[in-house]
């Protein structure tokens, strides 16, 4: 019989007892609802722990999950995260940098001077295509604090387009950050979709 149980990822760092969640130990994460799920998501958000969604990381699945709710445009993803002070910023692919420069009517060199060197990574949804990346610092220089808007919104990087979804490098899944209400909504709806399509799958806490 195929084992339909998956081990939790980052969530295993969470001390359930410390947060009054000891009664959830051994529970199926995918089946949690109501106050228990709300308290767990709030706690994970406070600890900056993302949740893995056991769905293939495909454009269709990403768009499906993003459609479950709407971004509140709080702007928190555009500023430094106090729980992750070592974050280098917003990752931008080379072709995205060119689009941003064109949108701002500036040169690629000028934009490059605003960033730091990134790394070579597979392009999202195209694992055979490698691309250099750059890091935009936080707070993002294109974030307008009042009224929480973006100077490059039409050409914003893919990491901004799909936030709070995070690419993990695993084609079999992706993660969702839950330190905003939008992320919490997406997790609840994504888990409901997984339960509906794979009712035997379990992720034990």
Predicted regions and their residues:
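Short loop/turn segments that flank or connect secondary-structure elements
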Residues: 1-205
